[in-house]
Curated annotation (Swiss-Prot):
Localization terms from the record: Cytoplasm
UniProt main location, coarse: cytoplasm
Organism, scientific name: Kosmotoga olearia (strain ATCC BAA-1733 / DSM 21960 / TBF 19.5.1)
Comment on bound cofactor: Binds 1 Mg(2+) ion per subunit.
Active site: 178 (proton acceptor)
Cellular component GO terms, alphabetical: cytoplasm
Known catalytic reactions: 3-methyl-2-oxobutanoate + (6R)-5,10-methylene-5,6,7,8-tetrahydrofolate + H2O = 2-dehydropantoate + (6S)-5,6,7,8-tetrahydrofolate
Enzyme Commission identifier(s): 2.1.2.11
Obligatory cofactor(s): Mg(2+)
Top EC class, one word: transferase
Gene Ontology MF annotations: 3-methyl-2-oxobutanoate hydroxymethyltransferase activity; magnesium ion binding
Residues the record lists as binding 3-methyl-2-oxobutanoate: 41-42, 80, 109
Gene name as annotated: panB
Protein name: 3-methyl-2-oxobutanoate hydroxymethyltransferase
Presence of the UniProt keyword Transferase in the record: yes
Amino acid sequence: MNIRQIINSKGKRKLSMVTAYSYFQAKMAEEAGIDMILVGDSYGNTILGYENTLPVTMEEMLIAVSAVRRGAPNTFVIADMPFLSYQVSEEKAIENAGRFIKVGANAVKLEGGAEVAGLVKKLVDFGIPVMGHLGLTPQHVNVIGGYRVQGKTDKSVKRLLEGVKLLEEAGVFAIVLELVVEGIAKKLTEETSVPTIGIGAGRYCDGQVLVWHDLLGINTEFSPRFVKRYANLRKDIVDALKKYNEEVKNGEFPGPENVFESGGFDE
């Protein structure tokens, strides 16, 4: 899938996107036929164990993006630009976005509306595709005072509508809508010619994205209403590890089938 196919999908078919942070995650996502992979700054929460996304660095994200590209060579990959990788200056933002493209990303994602529209236009003008992100923007968690549903007040709706318009004019190819009231997300989707990708934004967006660890039931401590679990891998993994631990301690593993005879490796 390429930029043109993503844009042309609007009104014709839904887009699927999932986060991934490693070679094998990406490989499985591509095998499943997922349209787009987002190497999210949620890498900080899900892989590195940070409380939120703010501590994630460019260097950490670059490693994840390059691993994902190797695992999914034929899937459209978007790199999340981490906190302070694009806010300090336009020059630094362009440099950092370019670094993601060099290691294999097809596009980058930035949070914000009016405050980043000018930067988005410059990135696009320099040949770097950009995905927008409105609604709940996790990098602003300290300003907004937590993870709150957006679009509940007239002021919030006005800001979202303005953001969609400005991002579209700046040249984004798609916009993530996170934790937005369903009716407002529907209106935003209808107001723009670019696809919207929802996460906790209801049924009427042009596509959906979920975090790997949420949809596969790995992060069971986090159970927001908008997440649907398609597996219970945490239980399966813990059960397998318990079985391994038990078999090692009682001498059942390794068994005869797991050892080499005097001849060495099988030929």
